[in-house]
Amino acid sequence: MAAKEIIFHDGARAKLVEGVNLLANAVKVTLGPKGRNVVLERSFGSPVVTKDGVSVAKEIELADKVQNIGAQLVKEVASKTSDAAGDGTTTATVLAQAIVREGQKYVAAGLNPLDLKRGIDKAVAAAVDELKKISKPTTTSKEIAQVATISANGEESIGQRIAEAIDRVGKEGVITVEDGKSLADELDVVEGLQFDRGYLSPYFINHPERQLAVLDEPFILLHDKKISNIRDLLPVLEQVAKAGRPLLIVAEDVEGEALATLVVNNIRGILKTVAVKAPGFGDRRKALLEDIAILTGGQVITEETGLTLEKATLQELGRAKRIEVGKENTTLIDGAGDKPNIDARVKQIRAQIAEATSDYDREKLQERVAKLAGGVAVIKVGGATEVEVKEKKDRVDDALHATRAAVEEGIVPGGGVALIRVKQAIAALAGANADQKAGISIVLRALEEPLRQIVANAGEEASVVVATVAAGQGNYGYNAATGEYGDLVESGVLDPTKVTRTALQNAASIAGLLLTTDATVHEAPKDAPPTAPAGVPGAGAGGPGFDF
């Protein structure tokens, strides 16, 4: 096992704070509409230019082991905030730095770190309650566009695209972001349920100009096994032919004699059919087939439920208004499923999302919710160079998450004003003792910091602006984009409540841990012998902190 170095007390905290400051100083320059860019080196390819706080934080790894521990803890603030709210990473970093900086002064002056932390926690809980009081729900497409615009560093075109996407697919729909192939941003919307499986034979195509097989008012047969024997299918094919409707077959696979017979009947015009493979694999395939069944009002023909192909009836088949099958995708439009059943299925999947431990599982479950409840929109981000597209794509991602957060918990005035109003509301909060009162004052001072940083990045005098905003009421604040004071909600400067709340809670959590840290253990440098624990009286021949 490698030798370890141990540092105690003020020596440990001072190094940790240095690491916090190094990371936070690099991240906070990106805050606000006039935030600056940070250039990130890449081992391969061109450097990345970004204004995304979490992207900057993730790149930082410090040479000094103890400083790096401090930096990694603040990186955790940014990452956790990004995971929970999708935005607010820079605000969280600025708040964490402010709480640590102010708290370190009190700890150095001899105050009890645990009481300081209790005071910090008490102030944050009161601040969160106050945030919820001043929050108001997002009701219009315009407000959604404004939230997205602010999160995208003031780029209105991004805000409009996201608002348009949400209008098209609904608040439950999935919106994904991809690299575009042109200079302009584009929006593609898939309405209905789409899955990534295409026709099993090009002979099913009936729209050659679009290379699609299109079925109007079809029946849908869902089966979880391979179909190779046409005799298994004959009873259901005869019933569908009598009804005079086309048929979509979704099964694990359709092959051999069964596929050949379907193709021949299709070419001769006896029965219009299309066969596709079921999406997904294993348990996920079963779940997706069940989703399609609920959406189309049918049942999955499976031995597990006692149903067989030979005995299948039209009542067990799903229905849809229209189905389009391409080489790689199948889209079901306007399924005939009952709304209560679809809602119940969505609720069930939501419960699974809440319990999911992996990001991949969560993402796939979220996709299933969207396909059942809304649709899928793809924003294709355009730009002149790869670097520009990457930077813009990061901002679109942030804006997208911010709008989701706004829909979830509502909005507050942006530009750091909400935290100033919260500060005023909890200014009279009392602690159980003087040390807790000091902890509360740490948070009160930190609540000004996002506004101070936004103003500093805009090249103005922070103290003057903070005093002017504090003298106002409600939504009155400073719009750094225009350099003017006014009602920020009216001028479209909004923040999602969830983003501001999450940033404050995560910042206080990590800052509290740092302030109550009294020792660090880290690997000793390979080219130096282990040293005595710093800050321990009488350690080694020369006293605290000396080599021995």
UniProtKB/Swiss-Prot annotation:
Xref: Pfam families: Cpn60_TCP1
EC code(s) of this entry: 5.6.1.7
Keyword entries, A-Z: ATP-binding, Chaperone, Cytoplasm, Isomerase, Nucleotide-binding
Stored CDD domains: GroEL
Residues noted as binding ATP in the record, renumbered to the chain: 30-33, 51, 87-91, 415, 479-481, 495
Gly residues bias (residue ranges): 537-548
Keyword presence, Hydrolase: no
GO molecular function: ATP binding; ATP-dependent protein folding chaperone; isomerase activity; unfolded protein binding
Principal subcellular localization: cytoplasm
Protein name: Chaperonin GroEL 2
Organism for this UniProt entry: Burkholderia pseudomallei (strain 668)
Encoding gene per record: groEL2
